[in-house]
């Protein structure tokens, strides 16, 4: 209503607000309660996610290998003590292969991970608890209803092969904050539909475009035919050599363009 919305919590308390910014993940309860429809595409892959300790220092460098069954990413972490031998891994695999990897004991899993990662960080010393997450592309038909705006994975999820999901979420937050500030400065409610529609118009086309590009990359790296592999390798090498183009790609991925 004109006074905003009321949110009933599990403990029985009620919170009133002019705007609910819903960033409650891919299985968003807020999205469900608001009746916002979702388009979904199952990749038929699962991501194995865990934290590992490696023999070699990661030097704050993210590494990703595009394997025939799916990409494997090592994302650098730093402990409170400053140790630089831990990485978060995201290993995308077909469902049956992922299940087999999950069934391995820690030692066998570390060996399989070393082989898949080409031992770029030396031996895998230890592995934490593993999680298997189904990979799906999701996109809300609408991000907003009066008083509510979806952000991040609540609005869209994409394949993790380029790590763009979190960047898209950050860009959603920036856009919503800017539109809310603009509305408040004009004397409007932050949950006003005109404000939220401006947010949606800013973010939806960009998110859809990024999702399409990531789907193209996924298909490109899945194709193991010789002509495509040669073209792919030559193209990646060319981008890496051409500084201005490389910087343009990086800035686009970071949402700075």
Residue spans for each PLM region:
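A conserved short coil-to-beta-strand element within the FAD-binding core of flavoproteins
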Residues: 1-5
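A conserved FAD-binding loop/helix module that cradles the flavin
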Residues: 159-172
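Core beta-strand elements of the Rossmann-like FAD/NAD(P) dinucleotide-binding domain
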Residues: 10-19
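Central beta-strand plus flanking loop segment that forms part of the substrate or channel wall
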Residues: 27-62, 72, 93-97, 113-114
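Short FAD-binding loop at a beta-strand-to-alpha-helix junction that anchors the flavin cofactor
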Residues: 142-161
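Conserved FAD/dinucleotide-binding core of flavoprotein oxidoreductases
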Residues: 67-134
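C-terminal helical "tail/cap" subdomain of flavin- and related membrane-associated enzymes
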Residues: 178-257
